[in-house]
Amino acid sequence: MNQQTVNVIGAGLAGSEAAWQLAKRGIQVKLYEMRPVRQTAAHHTDKFAELVCSNSLRSNTLANAVGVLKEEMRALDSAIIQSADKCSVPAGGALAVDRHEFAQSVTDLVKNHPNVTVLTEEVTEIPEGPTVIATGPLTSESLSQQLKELTGEEYLYFYDAAAPIVEKDSLDMEKVYLKSRYDKGEAAYLNCPMTEEEFDRFYEALTTAETVPLKEFEKEIFFEGCMPIEVMAKRGKKTMLFGPMKPVGLEDPKTGKRPYAVVQLRQDDAAGTLYNIVGFQTHLKWGDQKEVLKLIPGLENVDIVRYGVMHRNTFINSPSLLNPTYQFKQRNDLFFAGQMTGVEGYVESAASGLVAGINAAKLVLGQDLVTFPQETAIGSMAHYITTTNQKNFQPMNANFGLLKELPVKIKNKKERNEEYAKRAIETIQTISKTI
């Protein structure tokens, strides 16, 4: 066992994963988490890896880059993916979890490791010695100021938003049908079909509803993947009909016809009593939220157990500050991980924590750090956030477009993605034997 200690600040998805990767390599870890001593604007519990937005970790198939990313993480013994697999709920081809069971599983896994010491306190200064900063998009003001001084850069910032969660028992199941788009996987979504007239009425209410006002100094920059539904609506009706309310592949089994629009609800807990409204992240005032949602067929008497909220997200300019190892360029024993690096999404955040944890361990053990190759989803994300244009840096999800091009061009997209996936997994399996 190595006696040198690594500090990990933040026990979210990235911090928990980093702590796990360090601990399993025999490194002593001091894991700092300020909750519940000090809560954030979006968290509700003191559990590690609490999911504050959707309960879906997105696609679980190798036809999608985030599915490949998960498979790579399984090969590297990821605590986050291990817990997600254990706490999954039905979601078609996606990996969705019971958020409470999932957070408890991660907490137990990390907290109970003999090499991990948990300190429940707010970190206001960056500690000396090997450190992984994974404080997330809701980093406290005092630490944010420290980071600003350290980096010499102004933060970029944006908002993302959480969708409402509703009780299944309050839905009118006569108007709702169970189906997954194109009948892929098991039927896992509740679908609320709309006629054009119903959609127009809903659209009018949504675009005229009141939102919670933003502070004057705050500038609105939304990441496309978690854009508030009311902001999307103001871009035009078609934005919604080609977005979260897209009816394609969701024909109503009663009529055999495609509705004009569809609102989908996805199971949010293992018991199947709670559902979240897919793509309906919102910052509407709570009274307005309920009135707008009641216009969705089947939700006329809806009981909302958690209203949608919006919170500020903060991330650093990684292209100018980080190496692909997630190591800070100006201090080699300091690593960053999670959404604050500009990776976007639960799985991507955990993957960055995995890399930062592995490399912090390598540093302490006096070994060469690992730069994951661009042939892998993990490596392509690290490469993107550290080499893309500094001036226009924006968060990025895992996607096949980030991976290194195949040596032979394949025109068929499905076949091309299959080849990307095969190469990525073969590459990571080889790497996993050496780290």
From Swiss-Prot:
<keyword id="KW-0819">tRNA processing</keyword>
<dbReference type="InterPro" id="IPR020595">
    <property type="entry name" value="MnmG-rel_CS"/>
</dbReference>
<dbReference type="GO" id="GO:0030488">
    <property type="term" value="P:tRNA methylation"/>
</dbReference>
<keyword id="KW-0808">Transferase</keyword>
<dbReference type="GO" id="GO:0002098">
    <property type="term" value="P:tRNA wobble uridine modification"/>
</dbReference>
<dbReference type="GO" id="GO:0047151">
    <property type="term" value="F:tRNA (uracil(54)-C5)-methyltransferase activity, 5,10-methylenetetrahydrofolate-dependent"/>
</dbReference>
<keyword id="KW-0520">NAD</keyword>
<keyword id="KW-0963">Cytoplasm</keyword>
<feature type="binding site">
    <location>
        <begin position="10"/>
        <end position="15"/>
    </location>
    <ligand>
        <name>FAD</name>
    </ligand>
</feature>
<dbReference type="InterPro" id="IPR004417">
    <property type="entry name" value="TrmFO"/>
</dbReference>
<dbReference type="GO" id="GO:0050660">
    <property type="term" value="F:flavin adenine dinucleotide binding"/>
</dbReference>
<comment type="function">
    <text>Catalyzes the folate-dependent formation of 5-methyl-uridine at position 54 (M-5-U54) in all tRNAs.</text>
</comment>
<keyword id="KW-0521">NADP</keyword>
<dbReference type="Pfam" id="PF01134">
    <property type="entry name" value="GIDA"/>
</dbReference>
<keyword id="KW-0274">FAD</keyword>
<keyword id="KW-0489">Methyltransferase</keyword>
<dbReference type="InterPro" id="IPR040131">
    <property type="entry name" value="MnmG_N"/>
</dbReference>
<dbReference type="GO" id="GO:0005829">
    <property type="term" value="C:cytosol"/>
</dbReference>
<protein>
    <recommendedName>
        <fullName>Methylenetetrahydrofolate--tRNA-(uracil-5-)-methyltransferase TrmFO</fullName>
        <ecNumber>2.1.1.74</ecNumber>
    </recommendedName>
</protein>
<keyword id="KW-0285">Flavoprotein</keyword>
<dbReference type="InterPro" id="IPR002218">
    <property type="entry name" value="MnmG-rel"/>
</dbReference>
<comment type="similarity">
    <text>Belongs to the MnmG family. TrmFO subfamily.</text>
</comment>
<dbReference type="InterPro" id="IPR036188">
    <property type="entry name" value="FAD/NAD-bd_sf"/>
</dbReference>
